[in-house]
């Protein structure tokens, strides 16, 4: 079967500058900002400034901005925490969701963005809040409505000697959307190895960790801010600098076993039923080992990437071989899955055995494999964690897959992970199935109903 090569569109895309200047900022409909809320935000920033003035290890400040709800990009901080040549949004180092009560007591999902800023940015924000607090207290009776704010004339604003009209309204907008400022800390005791992502600061990761008595080598650093730590190191970091931790997950994964395969070895007595491959597209597979004795072995280019000193058992070949068999000749084993796409060649990288393994080590291998095989655009990954993903943030594994896909223009087909038969309730997917850019798949029957072992997410 002869196929045309993949076409790549190349060119330069240009966008004409918008000749229209942005208009005067406005408050949302029916919004009311009370002086008490402005005062509380100011006091919170004052406490944060005091904390970071004493704790100088990160050469700046981490400030978590808790919003009242999920906010659009245009409704994030507009002026507070900005500083010369930097918009407020430029300093965002992390984002997460929390479930908390709203003003009516109903539990809703809210945004939290963590900023890394110089202390001068906090000082500036405090001064702006102080000015706006005074104006609202003295000239608007302690609260200002959307109608009053939007009637302000930028030319005749009476307080231009203190603050411009536009900046006055920008501060009010920030106050309307922001619930509070805080310094968020991770506080838990761990007993296993962890993959930790810390917030990016202006200090090299190894140098920063050494300030807290943690010394690591380069092979425990994934992308500059994602690191592998042992239990005592994790607990030490939590105790001394819990504010640094953006994401963390147990560094232990295992196969996301496809129940349809039942871990049976692929039959090898079907010789000569497949033509030799020609120029069919290649799919990359990152899994356990591949059995080169199977009938479709001509279609698979196998690379064994586990250490030669690790003994392999027959079980170490079952899952990986079965996955590649589906890609090469899937409908032969299950005619109901015939999609008319024909056969695909596979470049198979055996990175694991059937037992549990280090996610961190596999992630390092995945980046190396993808970067060295740029001709492959579609990758299959059936390795995942048996533990559920965090409710409020993406996993370090999922984030790394997203980075790899963005950097190398590839897509991963990732197993949604399966729950054990002993699990009766619904169970969320496991990392890295929370990757945003990946195509995550799970099992359904021919009526479209989820299988008993299917997990849910995110």
Model-predicted segments: where are they?
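Extracellular S/T/G-rich loop segment that most often corresponds to the catalytic His/Ser-adjacent loop
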Residues: 281, 289, 295, 430-458
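Active-site neighborhood of phospho(di)ester-bond hydrolases with catalytic His/Asp-centered motifs
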Residues: 287, 380-382, 412-419, 441-442
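Loop/turn-to-beta-strand initiation segments
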Residues: 343-345, 409-413
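Catalytic-core regions built around general acid/base machinery
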Residues: 396-409, 431
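A generic structural motif
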Residues: 103-124, 196-199, 220-233
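Subtilisin-like peptidase catalytic core
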Residues: 23-42, 46-50, 55, 72, ...
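Protease zymogen maturation seam
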Residues: 163-194, 206-282
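Acidic-leg catalytic submotif of subtilisin-like serine proteases
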Residues: 268-309
């Amino acid at each position: 079967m002869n196929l045309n090569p993949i076409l790549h569109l190349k060119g330069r895309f240009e966008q004409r500058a918008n000749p229209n200047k942005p208009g005067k900022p406005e408050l949302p409909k029916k919004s009311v900002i009370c002086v008490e809320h402005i005062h509380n935000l100011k006091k919170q920033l004052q406490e944060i400034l005091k904390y970071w003035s004493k704790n100088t290890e990160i050469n700046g400040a981490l400030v978590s901005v808790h919003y009242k709800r999920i906010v659009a990009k245009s409704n994030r901080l507009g002026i507070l925490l900005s500083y010369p040549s930097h918009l407020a949004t430029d300093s965002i180092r992390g984002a997460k969701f929390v479930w908390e009560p709203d003003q009516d007591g109903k539990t809703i999902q809210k945004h939290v963005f963590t900023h890394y800023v110089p202390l001068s940015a906090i000082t500036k924000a405090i001064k702006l809040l102080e000015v706006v607090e005074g104006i609202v207290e003295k000239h608007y009776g302690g609260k200002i409505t959307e109608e009053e704010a939007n009637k302000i004339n930028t030319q005749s604003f009476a307080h231009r000697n203190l603050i411009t009209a536009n900046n006055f309204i920008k501060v009010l907008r920030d106050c309307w959307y922001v619930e509070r400022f805080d310094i968020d800390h991770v506080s838990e005791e761990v007993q296993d190895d962890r993959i930790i992502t810390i917030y990016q600061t202006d200090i090299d990761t190894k140098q920063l960790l050494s300030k807290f008595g943690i010394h690591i080598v380069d092979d425990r650093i994934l992308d500059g801010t994602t690191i592998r730590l042992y239990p005592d190191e994790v607990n030490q970091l939590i105790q001394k600098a819990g504010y640094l931790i953006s994401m963390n997950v147990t560094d232990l994964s295992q196969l996301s076993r496809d129940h349809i395969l039942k871990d049976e070895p692929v039959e090898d007595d079907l010789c000569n039923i497949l033509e030799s491959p020609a120029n069919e597209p290649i799919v990359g597979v990152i899994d356990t080992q591949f059995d080169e004795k199977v009938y479709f072995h001509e279609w698979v280019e196998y690379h064994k990437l586990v250490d030669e000193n690790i003994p392999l058992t027959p079980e170490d070949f079952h899952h990986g071989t079965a996955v590649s068999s589906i890609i090469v000749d899937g409908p032969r084993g299950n005619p109901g899955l015939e999609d008319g796409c024909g056969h695909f060649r596979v470049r198979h990288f055996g990175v694991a055995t059937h037992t549990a393994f280090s996610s961190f080590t596999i992630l390092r291998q995945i980046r190396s494999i993808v970067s060295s095989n740029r001709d492959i655009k579609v990758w299959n990954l059936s390795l995942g964690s048996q533990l559920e993903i965090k409710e409020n943030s993406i996993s370090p594994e999922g984030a790394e897959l997203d980075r790899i896909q963005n950097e190398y223009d590839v897509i991963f087909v990732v197993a949604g992970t399966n729950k054990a038969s002993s699990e009766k309730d619904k169970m969320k997917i496991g990392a890295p199935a929370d990757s945003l850019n990946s195509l995550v798949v799970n099992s359904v029957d021919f009526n479209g109903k989820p299988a008993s072992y299917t997990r849910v997410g995110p």
